[in-house]
Amino acid sequence: MASIQCIERVYSCTVIYDDFIRINEEYVLSNDRRIASLTPCAGRCSTVFGDSVCRGCRRFNHEVIRWNTFTPEQQTTIWKRLDAQLDQILVPMLPFADLKHVEGFVLSKRVRLRDDASRGRKLYQALKICEKNKNFANESGLGIQSQQVKPIWQEFERRVLALAIASYDLAFLRADSISERLIHLAEEE
């Protein structure tokens, strides 16, 4: 049983699984039933250092912590908020992007996208690939040159993080206001 628990911890964040197989008296995850789960994680979570909003994926800290406990509907709500932020910031920054070309480029790099991924999400994935290797800029469909990748990425990161933090602050203020009203109503009764 200890080996199963260890394997569960290793795969719980990245894999949804149904089944183990037994090999040489040990339980091992069966590759036949493994399905990679899709999360907004960008692989550089800053919430572990105390940030309220992750600098990588821009989820709120409680969303990062509880992601695997959320229902698909709750996860979709979060994805939509994140995609709306990408649409608001990135789409105007890349006015010459050819979406069909971008989609083909992203798929050719084996990046998985949700079926309902927004235009901004697709542009983000392409720009992220180019940020790692600016030589892909010309083939990306983003309508930018390789020397533009870094400045666009840096400005995008600055703007989208500011928007995500403002979104968090607004959500916190709303929750605080609702809390105060509930306390006031309870005191009146």
Language-model segments: what does each one mean?
Residues A42, T76-D83, K100-E103, L107, ...:
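Generic detector of well-ordered alpha-helical segments enriched in charged/polar residues
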